[in-house]
C-alpha cells in the first residue's frame, strides 16, 4: 500500500539531514517524531548529550534544524527541539551513564523490581546503590541485559552524601 504524502519530510529524511550537524555540535539525535495530524503539523526532534541540554543549546539546535529543514520544499510545520524527558526509559549504556546519580525504578528480566541510585557503567553492567533496611546502603552490579525496564524517578529531597559517594557522584555534580 502506498504511503499518503503529507507534504512533510519523512522521519528518515529529517534524521539524515540533522544527525551529522547535531553530532558535530556534541549532541545525539535520539528520536524524530513527525505528527502530520496535528494542526499545524509538528516535527519534534529529541536530542541529548553527556553534558545535558540547556536553553541556549535548545535555541542553537533549533536554529540549526530550522536552517536545514527550510531547505526542503515542504508544507508548513511547527519545529520543536527537546530533551527526552525524565520519563524516558533507560535503554542504552549512554542513557545509564547520563543518569548517573539519579534514582531509578528498575525491573529485572526475572520480574523483580528494585529502586536504586544509578552509579558507574562499564562493560555492560551498571552499579546501582540500593537501600537495605533503613540505613544500610550497598552497590549491586547488574548486567544491562538483565534489565527489562528502567525509568528515572522524580525526587523531592536530596540523596544522602553516602549514597552519592557510592554512586560515584560528587555533591557538585549532584546539584548540576
From Swiss-Prot:
Family designation: Belongs to the RimP family.
Keywords from the named record: Cytoplasm, Ribosome biogenesis
Cellular component, GO annotation: cytosol
Protein name: Ribosome maturation factor RimP
Function: Required for maturation of 30S ribosomal subunits.
Organism: Mycolicibacterium vanbaalenii (strain DSM 7251 / JCM 13017 / BCRC 16820 / KCTC 9966 / NRRL B-24157 / PYR-1) (Mycobacterium vanbaalenii)
Keyword Cytoplasm: yes
Matching Gene3D superfamilies: RimP-like superfamily, N-terminal
Localisation per UniProt entry: Cytoplasm
